[in-house]
Amino acid sequence: MKRFWKDVAIDADRVVTLDGKPVRTPGRRPLALPSDALAEAVAEEWRAVGETIDPRTMPLTGLANAATDPIANDPTQFAARLAAYGESDLLCYRAEGPPPLVERQAASWDPLLAWARGRYDVTFAVTAGVMHVAQPAATVARLHEAVVAYDDFRLAGLSPVVTLTGSLVIGLALIKGEIDADAAWAAAGIDEDWSVEMWGEDWQAAELRALKRKEFGVGVEFLGLL
């Protein structure tokens, strides 16, 4: 679609407008943002559009659309899908060896699990290897409660953080300010970093990882604007 507007503004309800008309989501709802900072950031994406609209250059708009349409339609179900990552959290699956990798995982992941234990009154079953280990029912329930408590926009921002790291604990630690984006990404990438150190990295894997890091960063930015 070609650009058809000249002026981008924000109305009193924090709805982004194009030549005075509200931007609408794919579900035809006005795109109303919950904070001035996010409204301005989304408006800036629309101001930056060239001759044609490219959704890939408007990731904050995309997450806002997700919050306003599919997540708002059934936030409990969406939150449950995110909370399910706690049942097979990356941090609970450790390498069997070599010792330096085991130690690196423990140094990064043990403090995060300890934080979650104290914050949410949960316990975790940790294993070596990739075979699934069931988490205590109380842990699953309490982590679910923690995620369901978030509003639609925070769920939208949390989604790429959790899905790209494979860790609900990392996502919760980040949104609560326990760790920053760089520490979160580093914790999630320990296994990949080890493989690169041992055997090198091909360009396709490097490109894919860079794309994932960018998408992860958008989620972090989105959360920071709320």
Which residues are covered by each model-predicted region?
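An N-terminal structural lobe/cap that precedes and organizes the functional/catalytic core
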Residues: 1-73
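Conserved aromatic-histidine-acidic binding/catalytic patches
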Residues: 30, 97-104, 153, 157-161, ...
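Generic secondary-structure signature for well-ordered alpha-helical cores
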Residues: 48-51, 117, 121, 174-179, ...
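Short coil/turn segments at secondary-structure boundaries
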Residues: 55-58, 128, 200
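Internal, conserved structured core segments that host functional sites
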Residues: 76-142
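An internal, amphipathic alpha-helical element
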Residues: 131-205, 218
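Long, charge-rich low-complexity segments
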Residues: 206-226
